[in-house]
Design a protein with these regions (language model features):
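Hydrophobic alpha-helical segments
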Residues: 1-187
Length: 187
């Protein structure tokens, strides 16, 4: 099965998503260097749910307990594993601001998760957990023990919610055929 080539639900304009959601989408576009993002203007059609989802998503990233770089590594790994170009392109830009290097991006795509591959022990444990969540929808005892040796319980819960959220988001993006946003050059 493959994702649709064109949007199944087109991004909405101001009238479709409401003035409040439109304002939010425009502000988020300015922050990300794009027009109002297609993801937000599509989900904005579900007006109240959109704002609730945005609050939840914002509490995970950028407002979560995990360092921003680690959150971006999680999101990029999920985007890669799911083949979600929209999230990959968006978070390559955001990840660069959080310290994700070109080397990190290469390693994320070859799915190496050890200290020998250049990750810190904490990053390796996080990425191994994300991989297990993606492939089996749970984390085994050994990987969980490794993860918990690096993350406190609040961080561990947040990691599960962050990875699960971006799995859900990839499903939504791919199913709806949400197209990548054109990137505006700042100059």
């Amino acid at each position: 099965m493959s994702a649709p080539m064109a949007p199944r639900i087109a991004p909405g304009g101001r009238r479709d998503i409401g003035i409040v959601n439109w304002g939010i989408c425009r502000a988020l576009g300015v922050a990300s260097g794009t027009p109002p993002p297609n993801l937000f203007t599509t989900l904005g059609r579900q007006r109240g749910l959109f704002r609730g989802w945005l609050y939840f998503a914002g509490r995970l990233m950028p407002g979560g307990r995990l360092p921003r770089r680690e959150s971006e590594l999680v999101i990029l790994r999920v985007a890669h594993l799911r083949g979600c170009t929209y999230e990959w392109e968006h978070h390559v830009r955001l990840g660069a601001r959080a310290g994700v290097s070109d080397d990190d991006l290469q390693r994320i795509q070859i799915e190496r998760t050890t200290v020998a591959d250049g990750w810190s022990a904490r990053e390796a444990a996080i990425l191994a957990a994300v991989d297990q969540l993606h492939h089996t929808q749970e984390i085994g005892d050994e990987a969980w023990g490794d993860l918990r040796s690096h993350l406190d319980e609040r961080e561990a819960i947040e990691l599960l919610l962050l990875a699960g959220h971006y799995e859900m988001l990839a499903t939504t993006i791919l199913t709806l055929g949400i197209q990548p946003d054109p990137h505006r050059r700042r100059g």
